[in-house]
């Protein structure tokens, strides 16, 4: 009996209890919640259903809890149901009913934990979207890990997800990048507002290798040559770094295309039709204050140049025209003001602001020997994705960045995350998978085969704890997807790995010496197979490997 099965049973039982007493069943919530008590002595699961419903139907919650407990006790699969406190019901599940979770996991395999909770959603997930003016910095690396994991997580719940990178190749930052490349190619110092780092010299040299006469061209042609070739080279490096990090995108959209394709003009025309545009001081303004923004925004400057928001408006309209019903933007801490701005822009275009969802990520700091690490040899100023991977590897880098809520600043201790110790969270989880894999190999050598026919033999308290936690995996995925919080998967896996290690230390899985394999060995091996599957499924969502050996 999974937690979902138990929730359904509770609702069915509550419906019968209320109907029998001529009480209004409409008071029942659409979804009944069951939780695992903090103190296992209180039972396997608990529900506050009587507290939710009692007052609505005019019955003391504790009395209603008593009716529910009495009915549940007489139900197959329920070992006991007891009233606690003002109206809680603590439940114990019969081992035979609880242990079917193991068989469900083995049967479902890679799809265990998947659901159709988001099957109707068509989601555009935009993340990283770093300017092609330098390597991915550590903040962008956090989004590369979290965004990719979130995309995988949403897909497990049935959503159609398109991962998109908005390629900012329009504006002043590109002009500064080009000036920096030209200065490097000429052997001149970096411009005051330019980009430093050895990568600038490398790209400048590659531009000259592709077009040896670039520096001899007229100024405008020279700048365009360095722009076209340099931006392509930089973006190729970014794509390779992201791919090596395990993050790939379905779509790359160029900001410049919003301006050259007429998309900006189309968006402004739509806004004019909606009465959301006005002219003042020679500029074109958007009435975003009518839709919750703190001030109106300039769309076209007085010199005729489009403001940055013009591209945002065109890009959002483009996404909606491609059929997305939810557009998730993952932005850095310095973009907090974009939340109201983007939602107001959606409303001004005549759309539902809830089609826009903005996630703001906080800072990432690296620490070595208790001291902050601030400089990158390649980038010159900031720590990059490549720096982090070189220091601790892809798996540890991804896990360390996903493990905390994005609205929390994080410090990554390079010594900790590169260590082979239980204090290293990713090592702890991966070691559990490797240990389970070794167990499977040893079982094969001994001729022991996992069998779910005798799961009723799994009665040890450590077995029960492990099985109940395995049953939580679908709920963890559903809630993590709904809340856009992939870090919940990390915390769950660490908890599950701990339950497995404690089970392994208390319950011998394989026969020893001349002992013949028995039904208990086979049942425990099935439990281990299920545990290994869930850990592998969770790590796959995070984009972290599940090693067979360590």
From Swiss-Prot:
Stored InterPro entries: aa-tRNA-synth_I_CS (IPR001412), Arg-tRNA-ligase (IPR001278), Arg-tRNA-synth_N (IPR005148), Arg-tRNA-synth_N_sf (IPR036695), ArgRS_core (IPR035684), DALR_anticod-bd (IPR008909), Rossmann-like_a/b/a_fold (IPR014729), tRNAsynth_Ia_anticodon-bd (IPR009080)
Keywords: Aminoacyl-tRNA synthetase, ATP-binding, Cytoplasm, Ligase, Nucleotide-binding, Protein biosynthesis
Gene3D superfamilies assigned: Arginyl tRNA synthetase N-terminal domain (3.30.1360.70), HUPs (3.40.50.620), Isoleucyl-tRNA Synthetase, Domain 1 (1.10.730.10)
SUPFAM superfamilies (alphabetical): Anticodon-binding domain of a subclass of class I aminoacyl-tRNA synthetases, Arginyl-tRNA synthetase (ArgRS), N-terminal 'additional' domain, Nucleotidylyl transferase
CDD domains (UniProt xref): Anticodon_Ia_Arg, ArgRS_core
GO biological processes: arginyl-tRNA aminoacylation
Pfam families: Arg_tRNA_synt_N (PF03485), DALR_1 (PF05746), tRNA-synt_1d (PF00750)
Example GO molecular function: ATP binding
Keyword Nucleotide-binding attributed: yes
Keyword tRNA-binding belongs to the record: no
E.C. number: 6.1.1.19
Position of sequence motif 'HIGH' region: 130-140
Subcellular location: Cytoplasm
Cellular component, GO annotation: cytoplasm
Catalytic reaction equation(s): tRNA(Arg) + L-arginine + ATP = L-arginyl-tRNA(Arg) + AMP + diphosphate
Family to which the UniProt record says this protein belongs: Belongs to the class-I aminoacyl-tRNA synthetase family.
Quaternary structure and interacting proteins, as annotated: Monomer.
Matching HAMAP family: Arg_tRNA_synth
Name under which the protein is recorded: Arginine--tRNA ligase
GN (gene name): argS
């Amino acid at each position: 009996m999974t937690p979902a099965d138990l929730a359904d049973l509770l609702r069915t039982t509550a419906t019968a209890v209320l109907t029998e007493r001529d009480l209004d069943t409409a008071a029942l919530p659409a979804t009944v919640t069951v939780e695992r008590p903090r103190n296992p002595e209180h039972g396997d699961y608990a529900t506050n259903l009587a507290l939710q419903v009692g007052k609505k139907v005019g019955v003391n919650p504790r009395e209603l809890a008593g009716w529910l407990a009495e009915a549940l006790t007489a139900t197959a699969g329920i070992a006991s149901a007891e009233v606690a406190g003002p109206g809680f019901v603590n439940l114990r599940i019969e081992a035979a009913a609880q242990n079917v979770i193991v068989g469900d996991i083995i049967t479902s395999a890679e799809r265990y934990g998947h659901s159709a909770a988001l099957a109707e959603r068509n989601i555009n997930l935009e993340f990283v979207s770093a300017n092609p003016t330098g390597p991915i910095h550590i903040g962008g690396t956090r989004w590369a890990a979290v965004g990719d994991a979130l995309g995988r997580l949403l897909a497990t719940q049935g959503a159609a997800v398109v991962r998109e990178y908005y390629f900012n190749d329009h504006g002043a930052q590109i002009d500064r990048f080009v000036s920096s490349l030209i200065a490097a190619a000429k052997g001149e110092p970096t411009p005051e507002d330019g980009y430093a780092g050895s990568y600038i010299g490398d790209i400048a040299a590659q531009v000259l290798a592709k077009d040896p006469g670039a520096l001899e061209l007229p100024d405008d042609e020279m700048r365009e040559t360095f722009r076209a070739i340099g931006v392509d080279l930089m973006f190729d490096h970014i794509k390779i770094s992201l791919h090596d990090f395990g993050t790939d995108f379905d779509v790359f959209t160029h900001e410049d295309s919003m301006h050259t394709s007429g998309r900006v003009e189309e968006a402004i025309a739509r806004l004019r039709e909606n009465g959301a545009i006005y002219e003042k001081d020679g500029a074109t303004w958007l009435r975003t204050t009518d839709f919750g923004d703190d001030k109106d925004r300039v769309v076209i400057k007085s010199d005729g140049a489009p403001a940055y928001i013009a591209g945002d408006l065109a890009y959002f309209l483009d996404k909606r025209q491609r059929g997305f019903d939810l557009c998730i933007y993952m932005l850095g801490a310095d973009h907090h003001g974009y939340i109201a701005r983007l939602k107001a822009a959606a409303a001004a275009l005549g759309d539902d602001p809830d089609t826009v969802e903005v996630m703001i990520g906080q800072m990432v700091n690296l620490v070595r020997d208790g001291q902050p690490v601030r400089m990158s040899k390649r980038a010159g100023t900031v720590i990059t994705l490549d720096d982090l991977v070189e220091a601790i590897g892809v798996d540890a880098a991804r896990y360390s960045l996903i493990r905390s809520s994005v609205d929390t600043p994080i410090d990554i201790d390079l010594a900790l995350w590169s260590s082979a110790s239980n204090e290293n969270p990713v090592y702890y989880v991966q070691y559990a998978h490797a240990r389970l894999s070794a167990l499977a190999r040893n079982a094969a050598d001994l001729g022991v085969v996992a069998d779910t026919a005798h799961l009723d033999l799994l009665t040890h308290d450590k077995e029960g704890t492990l099985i109940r936690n395995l049953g939580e995996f679908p709920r963890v995925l559903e809630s993590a997807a709904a809340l856009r919080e992939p870090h919940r998967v990390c915390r769950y896996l660490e908890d599950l790995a701990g339950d497995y290690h404690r089970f392994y230390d208390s319950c011998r899985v394989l026969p020893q010496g001349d002992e013949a394999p028995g039904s208990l060995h086979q049942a425990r091996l099935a439990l281990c197979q299920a545990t290994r599957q869930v850990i592998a499924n969770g790590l796959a969502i995070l984009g972290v490997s599940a090693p067979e050996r360590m």
